[in-house]
Design a protein with these regions (language model features):
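Terminal low-complexity/charged segments
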Residues: 1-186
Length: 186
């Protein structure tokens, strides 16, 4: 009697999904690591899942990393926001980027993170890389006071001109009266 090779059990949908996830995860990891190698600047890349990754970068390398992300298919900014860390007197600025044109990346979001100090809250604008950064950078400037150098139009979106030097999303901002706005005579 000859021995026949043992047949592999059929894969169940969960196993197939796990294999597909590993393939896509490795694809995202591979793309980001290739980008990191080509850049030759210090960045910290963390792939959190098959569709989420975070890149931490010094503000001096922000523009180079953004251009590299653009070159591998991340073609727009979804959101721009900031986090205020008063204990270290820093702001962390976050850009969430994705793709409309690359089907593989369309469901992927990469968060590009960088820090600026209270003493020098300036960053290069990423509007030249992604026009979709336009409104998010304006809002972050208005609400946190972070300047985006090279942005073509850093003017107010929501607040009245009387709010000059007042940044309501900073943790140091306190509302002094009930409600934010005071009725004024017409």
């Amino acid at each position: 009697m000859s021995a026949q090779p043992e047949a592999k059990p059929p894969q169940v949908p969960q196993q197939q999904a796990q294999q597909a996830q590993q393939k896509q995860e490795s694809s995202l990891s591979r793309k980001l690591n290739e980008m990191k190698t080509r850049l030759n600047v210090p960045v910290n890349v963390k792939v959190e899942s098959e569709r989420r990754a975070t890149i931490e970068v010094d503000k001096s390398n922000l523009l180079a990393v953004a251009m590299a992300l653009r070159s591998i298919g991340f073609d727009h900014v979804k959101t721009v926001t900031a986090i205020d860390y008063p204990e270290t007197e820093t702001f962390e600025v976050l850009y969430h980027v994705s793709s409309y044109t690359d089907f593989e990346l369309a469901k992927t979001i990469v968060t590009l993170r960088t820090k600026v100090s209270y003493k020098d809250p300036t960053l290069p604008s990423l509007h030249p890389v992604w026009e979709s950064a336009w409104t998010g950078e304006r809002e972050t400037y208005e609400m946190f006071g972070i300047r985006f150098e090279g942005h073509p139009d850093l003017r107010r979106l929501f607040l009245d001109e009387d709010f000059e030097g007042v940044y309501p999303m900073r943790k140091s901002y306190k509302v002094k009266t009930e409600g934010l706005f005071v009725d004024r005579p017409a």
